Design a protein with these regions (language model features):
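C-terminal beta-strand of the catalytic ATP-binding
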Residues: 121, 209-212
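Mobile active-site "lid"/loop adjacent to the S-adenosyl-L-methionine
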Residues: 121-150
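Conserved Class I SAM-dependent methyltransferase catalytic core
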Residues: 146-209
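Residue-level detector of flexible, active-site-proximal loop/helix-junction positions
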Residues: 100-102, 199-200, 212
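Structural motif
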Residues: 22, 106-107, 134, 161, ...
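Conserved RecA-like P-loop NTPase ATPase core
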Residues: 118, 134, 155
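Conserved SAM/SAH cofactor-binding pocket of Class I
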Residues: 1-62, 66, 70-117, 122-127
């Protein structure tokens, strides 16, 4: 597919979506994030990435890049500056402030080639025993209900129709969640379910597809 249509859910600051755009510049990528705090950085990263398209992406978290991107090249005058302030900014990847649990309701059927997501996946019990460095992260980015599966359940149940036949769903998972997530996908009719390991040898990525027929 020359220009795949990609949706990144629970995008955070845009690592997955921007990474896809980096390696496939023709991709049409939308990143969806619920957290207002994270969305600020998602917007900035998507805008800054314009400078680095075509395999030259700069450090997207470099504060100086934000300052340089935000500064006008010259004074357009009061009238034009006011219009520019209201204009929709240009993005390499389209950021959307939205909720994974409801965003599917507005998606047309069969229009996406790929959905990716690195959702929260810690259980309530795991949240009570976090390592100190992890405990500093926002709970919203970590917690996924009593069983750690609430996001995977929503993805498995509601997002298949948004993909074209044969389109792929790629999910990061916790190292102990392979069987549970695979079962959710199978129960909802996903095809060609497989798991990939990370460099540490742990189960880390579930891949599945909308059936061709």
């Amino acid at each position: 597919i020359a220009a795949p249509r990609v949706l990144d859910l629970c995008a955070g600051t845009g690592c997955l979506g921007l990474g896809i755009k980096r390696f496939c510049p023709a991709a049409q990528v939308t990143c969806v994030e619920k957290s207002p705090e994270a969305f600020v950085y998602l917007e900035k990263n998507c805008r800054c990435a314009l400078k680095g398209q075509g395999g030259q992406t700069e450090d997207l978290l470099e504060p100086a890049a934000f300052e340089q991107e935000a500064a006008p090249a010259f004074d357009w005058g009061p009238a034009l500056n006011a219009l520019r302030a209201k204009a929709k900014p240009a993005y390499a990847v389209q950021p959307v402030e939205g909720d994974l649990f409801t965003y599917w309701q507005g998606l047309p059927e069969g229009q996406l080639d790929l959905i990716v997501s690195n959702p929260p996946y810690l259980t309530a019990e795991e949240m009570r025993h976090l390592q100190p460095e992890v405990a500093q992260e926002p709970a919203m980015a970590l917690e996924a209900g009593k069983d750690g599966l609430v996001f995977y359940r929503a993805l498995a149940e509601h997002y298949q129709n948004a993909l074209r036949p044969g389109g792929a769903l790629v999910l990061e998972i916790g190292w102990q969640q392979r069987q549970a997530v695979a079962a959710l996908l199978a129960a909802n009719g996903w095809a060609d379910i497989e798991c990939r390991k990370d460099f540490g040898g742990n189960d880390r990525c579930m891949i599945s597809h909308r059936p061709e027929k």
